[in-house]
UniProtKB/Swiss-Prot annotation:
The chain crosses the membrane at residues 27-47. GO terms for molecular function: phosphate ion binding. Keywords: Membrane, Photosynthesis, Photosystem II, Thylakoid, Transmembrane, Transmembrane helix. GO terms for biological process: photosynthesis; protein stabilization. GO terms for cellular component: photosystem II; plasma membrane-derived thylakoid membrane. This is Photosystem II reaction center protein H. PANTHER family: PHOTOSYSTEM II REACTION CENTER PROTEIN H. It comes from the Bacteria. It is found in: Cellular thylakoid membrane. It is a single-pass membrane protein. Belongs to the PsbH family. One of the components of the core complex of photosystem II (PSII), required for its stability and/or assembly. PSII is a light-driven water:plastoquinone oxidoreductase that uses light energy to abstract electrons from H(2)O, generating O(2) and a proton gradient subsequently used for ATP formation. It consists of a core antenna complex that captures photons, and an electron transfer chain that converts photonic excitation into a charge separation. PSII is composed of 1 copy each of membrane proteins PsbA, PsbB, PsbC, PsbD, PsbE, PsbF, PsbH, PsbI, PsbJ, PsbK, PsbL, PsbM, PsbT, PsbX, PsbY, Psb30/Ycf12, peripheral proteins PsbO, CyanoQ (PsbQ), PsbU, PsbV and a large number of cofactors. It forms dimeric complexes.
Amino acid sequence: MGQKTALGTLLKAIGNSGQGKVVPGWGAVPIMTVIGLLLLVFLVILLQIYNQSLLLQGFSVDWNGN
């Protein structure tokens, strides 16, 4: 059998703490909704920068490498 380490003991305690338990009600839905919306906003901003429809002062987008 392998050695017992403090890190292994900590990770095992964290990993097994909620095993088999379901949070009643909405659970993690609100948190995941917020994270999803933030990701969507981030991707829309990236798309607007790529399409140059979002103009940033002092920031030029040149895809030719010039």
